[in-house]
Amino acid sequence: MDTQKQIHKTHNSKNQFFTIFFFLSVEFGKEGTRKNFYLLLSIGHYGRKSRRADLGTADTADKTEPECFAASWTFDPNPSVTVSGAHSTAVHQ
């Protein structure tokens, strides 16, 4: 699948953000480095901020997807521990 074509095909800004995030998460997930996790968390933070700017004061729309999105990507307060643990386990096996 051509990533650029898929992104340009999506006209809705909300869907476009999640489409871009999906492709980035798949791409960076292959490496699984601490830098990549922080980048993904930063992208998620930017997405929530821009969504609020787009929706203005629409509280119900603001609280549906962004909160769920935040929970799915910030469940681990210290991603470096998980990443280093995964790497060390793979090395020892």
UniProtKB/Swiss-Prot annotation:
It comes from the Eukaryota. Expressed in neuroblastoma. One of its GO terms (biological process) is nervous system development. This is Uncharacterized protein encoded by LINC01587. It comes from Homo sapiens (Human). The gene is LINC01587.
